[in-house]
Amino acid sequence: MKKWKDIHPISWTIIIGTIFGRMATSMSIPFLAIYLTAVQGASASYAGLVIAASSSVGILASFYGGYISDKFGRKNMMLVSIFGWMLVFAGFAAASNLWVFFVVNALNGLCKSLFEPASKALLSDMTEEKTRLLVFNLRYAAINIGVVFGPVLGLYFGSSQSTTPFLVPAVIYGLYGIVLALQFKKHPSLSAPAQSRNMSVREAFMVTQKDYLFTIALVGITLCTFGYSQFSSTFPQYMAQNPLIGNGTKLYGLMLTLNAIVVLATQFPIVHFAKRFSPLCSLMLGNVMVSISMAIFTVSHGVPSIVMIVITFTIGEVLLFSMMDLYVDQIAKPGLKGTYFGAIGFSQLGNVIGPWVGGICIDLFGAGRPIYIFSVLSGITLLGLPFLAFAYRQMKMETTKHRSRLEKPL
């Protein structure tokens, strides 16, 4: 209980705000691909491209967002991005042309990429090392509490048939921003680490680029993200278009809710076990589980199989995302945590390529041929395993060398 009492009030604001923010987002964004294909008449590949626009912009924006938060402080970056988010969701509600959805979702990715590195770095700044794993996982749990209710609300309000439900996230992010601004005013002593203030963006980029272990792991994490992206892009299109699946849109909404429930049920037991090992071990196992979940789709699409797919995928998701922030926090150079949390945003390349490749597979093979669609997607995801294994091996060797130097007699 003492660890819980050590959590800063602003950290609690971010955690609680995340619940409502993700609830609002998950009642709208996951249904966007279905809305674009069913109502707007877009092809599956174009719908995938619109979904990918968010992550595409985020690849570079997250690094700059993290760097700026290191240089000028977390507060301004978080407030600008969260009120920008409010306007973005209002834009979704007003959109009627396909190109507008592309632009607005790109801006959605920009706001997310600026807010998240700054908020994660702020959580790290305000938390003692012994409590950081708890704080990062409370934030992750908050995401999934929101996702338990969001898809159900999305089905109720008809998010796959109208853009009006996007007004709900607009209101919620506006309120979240106001509460956050009041908390910053109440606790005005927050500032950026001093070391990064005199470092140019090019110098900050070179620091992360020359970090060999970080770069190798980043490639593996990107391929994990490729697999993870299929759940919110290819899965809903496949479920809605497969002629053998009745009421696929409703079933997909229930899959999202089951996903969030399984996360909440398994997250802390898995983390309690996984914290005994390197975060890279969790990332490797998570990669394998996500790949297996897609492989199951190649042989069956019945309700029991779908439940098994969601459970397997979700365990992989927990292993990936419960330890990823801790890995970045551990490997980040002093004074550059925002930059490192931003640099991990380059892994969003997987979220750009994933929906696009998934959409192409559906267009190419047809939703009635899951064996081809998900064999390709599962195989690409599994390519991340060798990179993570290599990074783990190198990290283990460096740790051994460091211990040997410390134990060497003078």
UniProtKB/Swiss-Prot annotation:
The entry's keywords: Cell membrane, Membrane, Transmembrane, Transmembrane helix, Transport
Membrane spanning stretches: 14-34, 48-68, 82-102, 140-160, 164-184, 212-232, 251-271, 279-299, 303-323, 342-362, 371-391
Cross-referenced Gene3D superfamilies: MFS general substrate transporter like domains
GO CC annotation: plasma membrane
Cystine connections: none
Database matches in InterPro entries: MFS (IPR011701), MFS_dom (IPR020846), MFS_trans_sf (IPR036259), MFS_Transporters (IPR050171), Sugar_transporter_CS (IPR005829), Tet-R_TetA/multi-R_MdtG-like (IPR001958)
Ligase listed as a keyword: no
SUPFAM superfamilies recorded: MFS general substrate transporter
Source taxon at top rank: Bacteria
GO molecular function, one term: transmembrane transporter activity
Family assignment from sequence similarity: Belongs to the major facilitator superfamily. TCR/Tet family.
Name of the protein in its database record: Uncharacterized MFS-type transporter YqjV
